[in-house]
Amino acid sequence: MADQEADTNIEIWKIKKLIKGLESARGNGTSMISLIMPPRDQVSRVTKMLGDEYGTASNIKSRVNRQSVLSAITSAQQRLKLYNKVPTNGLVLYTGTIVNDDGKEKKVTFDFEPFRPINASLYLCDNKFHTGALNELLESDDKFGFIVMDGNGTLFGTLSGNTREVLHKFTVDLPKKHGRGGQSALRFARLRMEKRHNYVRKTAELATQFYINPATSQPNVAGLILAGSADFKTELSQSELFDPRLQAKILNVVDVSYGGENGFNQAIELSAEILSNVKFIQEKKLIGKYFEEISQDTGKYVFGVEDTLKALEMGAIETLIVWENLDINRYELKNSTSGEIVVKHFGKDQETDQSNFHDAETNAELEVQEKMPLLEWFANEYKRFGCTLEFVTNKSQEGSQFCRGFGGIGGMLRYQLDMRTFDELSDGEVYEDSD
């Protein structure tokens, strides 16, 4: 998967996590503000609106609710002062007083520029945060290439979301099969084959021109659909002339009754299901490749928290694969006697075991300096280790096996490593597996 696509997937994971946290938050009265400003909105407009809202809220009869609402509006106003103008992709702001699980009130504020433009405009004061508008950020904007090829010509197009675009089309005049006998028949057959070959060659060359990004030498589409009414599409897909980088991206070869734009529309309809499952297919391929490394015992794989983190620190991991719901926290702990900082990773069960928070040799208490979900740490830090980060689900058979059998964390390595030779821990850092 291209780096840009992997980065987008991580941004989507961050938004999913944020939505989950926001949706579960509850407040007393209407003290929780949800504010979304689309690109090209004016900060001055929203500042004025908040000023008007402050005046209205001053009349709320309940003193407690009035104070909470006024506090939330003030908080939103303060946050907006940090922005001279609305960022390129818009601005999302959630602020207010929420009630914790233990019944205590806590002020929270989240503000960020989305990773892609958000088209919603929203202002609501309620006892919960409204996150519905953020869902549009989770929709895939993958671009797919379409090549519609028949005996009359070829069309090159792309589809992204609901937007289809024709990149180029050209017509071709191929000789028909001939009824003449003798020498002519052979000559005509040869000419026909030659023209046909040239047609496939031209289509293959244009496909590289339209679907390979010259800057990165990588495909600029998430997948390719080949369509047509004759067997040209099959011939193209199997041809040596067709770029192998694009060959690897073929998702489907479909029969359509027409060429040109009508054929393009028909190909989109016939491929709808496979396009909606593309993430699923990519995930199956990724984990399948990982399992292949294991079955062939190449030594270019790791699994489990401990080994994966060791390999990561060494810069050996090329692709880090993590289950998107991995429930492990990363702790930075300070030895109360020596002052030494150690890093440990615990699952839910280990967090309740107090012996994990005492030094094994001296029984000195290990004080928590920092605690954060390991997934979040990966999302923030993975680039530092020169790897790509892929979040996977447990919805496919492969994904489920990866989560159950390998603890939901592993990596494919740049080079062969025997993890057993790295039993000596370095830098005084202690990694504890979640199993």
From Swiss-Prot:
One of the record's GO cellular component terms: cytoplasm
InterPro entries hit by this protein: eFR1_2_sf, eRF1_1_Pelota, eRF1_1_sf, eRF1_2, eRF1_3, Peptide_chain-rel_eRF1/aRF1, Ribosomal_eL30-like_sf
Modification sites for N-acetylalanine: 2
A Pfam family assignment: eRF1_2
Coiled coil: none
Keywords, comma-separated and alphabetical: Acetylation, Cytoplasm, Growth regulation, Protein biosynthesis
Compartments, record wording: Cytoplasm
GO terms for MF: translation release factor activity
Subunit structure comment from the entry: Heterodimer of two subunits, one of which binds GTP. Interacts with OR.
PANTHER family to which the protein is assigned, alphabetical: PEPTIDE CHAIN RELEASE FACTOR SUBUNIT 1
Family: Belongs to the eukaryotic release factor 1 family.
Note: Plants silencing ERF1-2 show increased elongation of the leaf petiole.
Function: Directs the termination of nascent peptide synthesis (translation) in response to the termination codons UAA, UAG and UGA. Modulates plant growth and development.
Protein name: Eukaryotic peptide chain release factor subunit 1-2
Species this protein is from: Brassica oleracea var. botrytis
